[in-house]
Amino acid sequence: TALQKGRDDRLILHGQAPGYVERRTFEQIEQWGDTYKHPELYDANGKRKFNKRMLYGEEIDGKGMFFEAQLKPVFPKDGKCDITDSGIHVYDTDEVYFVLSMATSFNGFDKSPSREGIDPSAKAAGILDKALSYNYRTLKQRHTEDYRSLFNRVDFKLASSPEQKAMPTDKRIEQFAQT
């Protein structure tokens, strides 16, 4: 994963996700005699290839999805910023907001994101450029509408008395289950 300053004062973070992650411990795998099920970690004789359960890049034949995030400070009035290894330093302004875009190399369930993936840099830049064409109010409105369409789809109300309303939800559910 690398951090860099991009064109027009964008902060860019790009990298590659692990190509393999094993949730079981080596001890569990070995105790259960399952080394043969994990050729990424063990050779044909059951010896460990690595002493870690998370493999990146060439350790795992280049597998792993690429990603990029781009962050751009926007100054509605005057303002400046410096992007350094230690952070984003904003000055000479009373107001700033940040626009963030992110993309991955995912190109379909049937394609390798590391070999047949799309360019996350170009995608993240395109998303950010499009977002920057809107003012803050419009961006917020569009974001809110998008969020609500995904997460505000259920209206759930429990009929209750004032005493029940004062009771924590977990206790109300417990009480309801007993009736």
Predicted regions and their residues:
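Aromatic-residue-lined binding/catalytic grooves and analogous aromatic/hydrophobic interfacial grooves
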Residues: T1-T179
